[in-house]
């Protein structure tokens, strides 16, 4: 199957992006190098082409009431121009996807609008699942700016950098706040809408914005001219792992529940509403979980990768879900599921790396978090 290309594919190639397959897309894994890109985001500012992500719009009446039956989080706690992180669940409490819900309020057409940003690999199944659960409602499901480009700009200098280019005040936009702005006429001939949110996947201050390809290309080039470092999937992974942010397919999946994954704060059982997976989660909240996701630090130079066994008292008890060398902390870190009874900080364990046992310890998560 031919891989899909984002609207910024050529721009990435021209900057030396090393392209790899990812969730049916051809995406840059790196530009100047993972360490340099990672450090740019931690210390200055970097940007990512994340146009492969799914962006879905729900329009109609009583959308929140319908959506409340599909997620375990209280969606009524957010209002227009606000957003929240949550998950879609199966009846057994397993996680179908993690996502961000953006409340756009009421449109000029008197319709309510909710925008969902979902994972690229889960886009088709999520849309099918939404359609099957909302088909009796007066709600339409469509891609939001289907031809658009999505860019993330992340790092301590992201606010000042983006404010200069967009000529738009952004420091007053709260965390998980969002709004639609009009593009700076100096960037593109015609003024166009840009959907911008103060969100990210790095543990740093940052923004994500969606616009037409033409506007995105103009902003991308202006960011490069301003000295912003282009970053690939490799740095995005090390950054999110340091911040203990979950990667779907690795750290969460259909066989893991929010309580097991350390996402219990997303589950609002105090709500009277029923939602898919509620019964399973109520039972788990009552009796506890058999496994938990923990942070691990390998105590030598061994790097634990996805699928490596975790041992306790020489017995295999778990599996690594994500692992890397942390450029910020200068040590190997990983996430893994282990039995709940040993999921305690300072528990001594081992990780089997290429048939050799390496000493490790369970540590507090996140490994690092400065901004978001």
UniProtKB/Swiss-Prot annotation:
Gene3D superfamilies: Aminomethyltransferase beta-barrel domains (3.30.70.1400), Aminomethyltransferase fragment (4.10.1250.10), Probable tRNA modification gtpase trme, domain 1 (3.30.1360.120). Its EC number is 2.1.2.10. GO terms for biological process: glycine decarboxylation via glycine cleavage system. InterPro entries: GCS_T (IPR006223), GCS_T_bac (IPR022903), GCST_C (IPR013977), GCV_T_N (IPR006222), GcvT/YgfZ/DmdA (IPR028896), GcvT/YgfZ_C (IPR029043), TrmE/GcvT_dom1 (IPR027266). One of its GO terms (cellular component) is cytosol. This is Aminomethyltransferase. The glycine cleavage system is composed of four proteins: P, T, L and H. GO terms for molecular function: aminomethyltransferase activity; transaminase activity. The gene is gcvT. The glycine cleavage system catalyzes the degradation of glycine. It catalyses: N(6)-[(R)-S(8)-aminomethyldihydrolipoyl]-L-lysyl-[protein] + (6S)-5,6,7,8-tetrahydrofolate = N(6)-[(R)-dihydrolipoyl]-L-lysyl-[protein] + (6R)-5,10-methylene-5,6,7,8-tetrahydrofolate + NH4(+). The keyword Zinc does not apply. Keywords: Aminotransferase, Transferase. Belongs to the GcvT family.
């Amino acid at each position: 199957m031919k891989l899909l290309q984002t609207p910024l594919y050529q721009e990435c190639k021209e900057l030396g992006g090393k392209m790899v397959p990812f969730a049916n897309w051809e995406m840059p894994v790196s530009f100047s190098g993972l360490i340099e890109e990672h450090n740019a985001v931690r210390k200055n500012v970097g940007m990512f082409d994340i146009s492969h992500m799914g962006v879905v719009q729900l329009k109609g009446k009583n959308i929140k009431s319908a959506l409340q039956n599909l997620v375990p989080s209280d969606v009524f706690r957010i209002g227009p121009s606000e957003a929240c992180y949550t998950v879609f669940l199966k009846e057994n409490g397993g996680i179908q996807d993690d996502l961000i819900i953006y409340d756009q309020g009421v449109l000029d057409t008197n319709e309510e609008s909710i925008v969902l940003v979902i994972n690229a690999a889960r886009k088709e199944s999520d849309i099918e699942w939404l359609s099957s659960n909302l088909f009796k409602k007066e709600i339409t499901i469509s891609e939001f700016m289907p031809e658009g480009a999505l860019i993330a700009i992340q790092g301590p200098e992201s606010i000042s950098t983006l404010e200069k280019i967009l000529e738009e005040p952004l420091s007053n936009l709260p965390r998980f706040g969002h709004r639609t702005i009009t593009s700076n006429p100096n960037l593109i001939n015609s003024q166009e809408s840009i959907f911008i949110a103060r969100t990210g996947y790095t543990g740093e201050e940052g923004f994500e914005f969606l616009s037409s390809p033409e506007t995105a290309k103009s902003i991308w080039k202006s960011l490069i001219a301003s000295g912003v470092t282009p970053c690939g999937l490799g740095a995005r992974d090390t950054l999110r792992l340091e911040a203990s942010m979950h990667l779907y397919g690795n750290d969460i999946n259909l066989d893991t529940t929010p309580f097991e994954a350390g996402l219990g704060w997303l589950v609002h059982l105090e709500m009277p509403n029923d939602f898919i997976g509620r019964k399973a989660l109520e039972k788990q909240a009552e009796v506890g979980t058999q496994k938990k996701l923990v942070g691990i630090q390998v105590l030598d130079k061994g790097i634990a990768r996805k699928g490596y066994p975790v041992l306790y008292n020489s017995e295999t008890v778990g599996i690594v879900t994500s692992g890397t060398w942390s450029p910020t902390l200068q040590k190997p870190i990983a996430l893994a599921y282990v039995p709940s009874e040993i999921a305690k900080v300072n528990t001594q364990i081992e990780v089997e790396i290429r048939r050799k046992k390496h000493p490790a310890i369970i540590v507090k998560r996140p490994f690092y978090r400065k901004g978001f």
